[in-house]
Every structure is written in C-alpha cells, then in structure tokens.
C-alpha cells in the first residue's frame, strides 16, 4: 500500500509544481494499454506497410510495464549565439509510475526535423495545438520513445528546441550551441523537479534520430565539458557532419533523394541568418525566385502539411536537383566550402570530440536521406584518434524511418545491460 501511495503522491503534487523558473503541467497518465498501442498500431502510421522497403523486418517491442505521467515543461533558457538573450523554451517530461522507486534511469531524447511547429515532444500527447490544424501524427517519434523507455521504467525528457513548441523565437535549426543549451537547461530543471519529490537519477542515457542524432552528440559534448557523466548513447540516421551531408545532396545526388531536402536548406539558411546575425545570407545563397517559398517553409506559413507538400512540389520543378535552388557560383563545390554558409554548416559537426562513453550509431542500408559514408564518419574519426567509443550499427533494408524504429527497439536491451 505504501509503495503504491508514493506514485499517487507524485501525481497529485506535480500538477502545479515548478522548479528553477520552470512550469510543469501534468497532461495525463498514459496506461500500459495506451503505451502498447503506440508500440504496435502507431508505428504503422509512422512507416506505412506500403512504404516499407522490401526485406525490412518490423521490430518487436517489449510490452510496457508501468503507466507513465506525462508533463509539458515550460522553462527559461538563454541563446548563446545572441549573447545569452533570454528565451522561453518548452519540452516534455515523462515519469514512469514505479512503486517505491527512489532512483530511476534517465533518458534524454532529441527529436528529428519536424515540419509543424507543434510536432514536438511537449505536444506529442496532445490532440490539439495553437496552430489550428492537427499535428499529432508528426510527433510519433516522441510517443514511441516514451512508450518504449518510460514504459520500462526510464524517466524520459525531451526538449522541443528553441523556436518550436511554445518557444517565443524563430527556429534554431542545427545551431549547435542553442540546441545544447535547450537540452542542458531542460535536464537541470527536470532533475530538480524530481529530486524535490524524492526521485534521484541512477544513470543518464542519450538518444536521438536524424537531426536529433546530431543534437545528441552535441549534447554529449556539452555534458562532458560540464563533467556530467553519461552512461551510453545511441543515434539513428544521424547527419554527424551537416557540411558533408549537404555536399552529398548537392554534388552527388541519387534517384532516391527525398523531395523535402529543399526544406533542410530553407531551415538551415534562415536559422543561420537570424541567430548568427548574418543579414542577407539567404539571398546570397539561393536564387531570388525561391526566397518567398523558402521563408514560408521556415516560418511554417502554410495551413497544413498537405499545403506544405504542395509547396515543395511546386518549387521542385526545375533542372539541377537541389543544386538548382542555388546561385550559379555554388555549382563549384569549393565555393561552398569557403562560403559563409559552408563554414556555418561545418561548424555544426558533432563527431570530432573524443567521447568518454559508448555511443551506438544506427544507419539504414536503404536510408534515402543519410548516406552510409556520412553515417560512418564519426566511427572512422574516433578510430583514427585512437578511440573505440563509437560503434556503427547496420540496419538491413531500413529507410530513414525504419532505422529509427529498429534503433529504438535494439537500444533498450543494450541500455538495460548497464544497470
């Protein structure tokens, strides 16, 4: 009876509590039945069977053990690139209701690129959002990680990143320092919140998919600098070096390259222009006729995701693939390397730090976004520096989404082995 009461007290007390300038709003409690539904039927919306590559095997997730209390977290942070200008940020905290628990493992999950402002962790369990159109399905990755990990007894935290969710700034896309700051400040307020209620951290793990893989290794760098121990991390389909990834898309295109690569260019350029205070950067890189459409992509100025897809298709009708959006001087790959845009991309890399804890990097053999050579960059660099901390993990016949599903499943057993 006493053990069960502990979980109940946590729920009741946490609803309106705050810690270190943060507000924690209880969104509800996900039952094990609801969590299991995410792990089974939910994934078929994320990767429909009709789009699944031939030969890909569905992972078989473990059934959830515990119900999970889900909170939206609103907290204060600062923007390193803008001289530590204050910013309102948001994220998610998911606490498994483990009877009598005094310490729990913690997983910080970093989400991938989203095309709706509210397709983020803090809105992953909300059917409505301030945008006026549904974005619930686009936040499946965050629900899966909560179901897979919090359902097995891990506390899960996940930052939205600056400019997404309820944040009051434009999106800070692939801006290393800002993404590190968003993650570390959420970690601090979440741990203070739990500690105040008698729950400590037993071990810290990190994970991220796609853009979130890049953020994960950036966060790992930050934690190492601060002397905060990380037990282990995994990434899935991570562009460890944004410059190398962009170079491959521009100068070595393949038939399988996705249409939405143009949105990556838009998000990156406008983020760099705003946060690195480089007026005119966007116009110096892309042809003027694409400026308005790229700005709409960055600001999410479209009524729904169908309209976004229509916009992407409309501006894709030109020769030259992704490079066709760029000014003529960018036809030379050397120019990109020496340009402000190229240098900003290169500064976003997150694999040249020697990691002090093991990292698994999953890549799919049929990933339409991340080339195998890019996926293996971090491991090869670490080996060259005498480190064996990074290990790449091949997911046979997996595309970009399938790689994430497989990594989320396989990593649980690996993380559990450290307890």
Residue map of PLM features:
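Alpha/beta-hydrolase active-site loop
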Residues: 173-195
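Primarily recognizes the serine-hydrolase "nucleophile elbow" in alpha/beta-hydrolase
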Residues: 188-256
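Accessory cap/linker subdomain of secreted extracellular hydrolases
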Residues: 239-352
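Catalytic-loop region of hydrolases
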Residues: 19-102
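N-terminal signal peptide c-region/cleavage motif recognized by signal peptidases
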Residues: 14-16
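Short beta-strand/loop motif that positions the catalytic acidic residue
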Residues: 355, 360-367
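Short, surface-exposed "cap/lid" segments of acyl-processing enzymes
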Residues: 83-90, 97-152
């Amino acid at each position: 009876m006493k053990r069960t009461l502990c979980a109940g007290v946590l729920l009741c007390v946490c609803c309106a509590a705050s810690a270190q300038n943060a507000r924690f709003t209880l969104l509800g409690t996900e039952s094990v039945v609801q969590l299991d539904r995410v792990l089974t039927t939910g994934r078929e919306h994320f990767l429909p069977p009709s789009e699944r590559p031939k030969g890909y095997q569905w992972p078989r997730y473990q059934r959830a053990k515990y119900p999970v209390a889900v909170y939206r977290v609103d907290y204060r942070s600062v923007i390193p690139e803008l001289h530590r200008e204050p910013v309102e940020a948001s994220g998610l905290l998911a606490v498994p209701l483990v009877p009598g628990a005094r310490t729990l493992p913690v997983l910080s999950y970093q989400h991938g690129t989203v095309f709706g402002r509210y397709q983020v962790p803090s809105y992953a369990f909300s059917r409505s959002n301030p945008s006026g159109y549904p974005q619930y399905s686009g936040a499946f990755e965050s629900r899966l990680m909560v179901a897979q990990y919090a359902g097995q007894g891990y506390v899960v935290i996940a930052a939205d990143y600056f400019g997404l969710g309820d944040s009051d700034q434009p999106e800070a896309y692939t801006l290393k320092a800002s993404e590190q700051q968003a993650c570390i400040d959420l970690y601090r307020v979440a741990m203070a919140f739990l500690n105040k209620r008698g729950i400590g951290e037993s071990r810290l793990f990190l994970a991220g998919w796609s853009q979130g893989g890049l953020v994960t290794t950036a966060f790992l760098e930050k934690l190492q600098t601060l002397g905060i121990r990380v037990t282990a991390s995994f990434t899935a389909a991570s562009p460890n070096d944004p410059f190398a990834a962009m170079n491959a898309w521009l100068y070595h295109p393949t038939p399988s390259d996705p249409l939405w690569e143009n949105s990556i260019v838009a998000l990156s350029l406008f983020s760099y222009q705003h946060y690195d205070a480089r007026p005119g950067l966007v116009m110096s890189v892309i042809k003027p006729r694409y400026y308005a459409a790229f700005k709409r992509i960055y600001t999410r100025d479209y009524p729904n995701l169908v309209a976004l897809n229509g916009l992407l298709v409309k501006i894709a009708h030109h020769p030259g693939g992704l490079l066709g959006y760029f000014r003529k001087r960018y036809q030379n790959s050397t120019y990109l390397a020496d340009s402000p845009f190229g240098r900003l991309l290169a500064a976003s890399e997150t694999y040249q730090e020697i990691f002090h804890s093991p990292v698994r990097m999953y890549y799919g053999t049929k990933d339409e976004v991340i080339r195998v050579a890019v996926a293996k960059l971090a491991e090869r660099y670490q080996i060259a520096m005498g480190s064996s901390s990074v290990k790449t993990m091949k997911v046979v016949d997996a595309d970009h989404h399938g790689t994430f599903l497989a990594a989320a499943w396989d990593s649980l057993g690996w993380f559990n082995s450290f307890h």
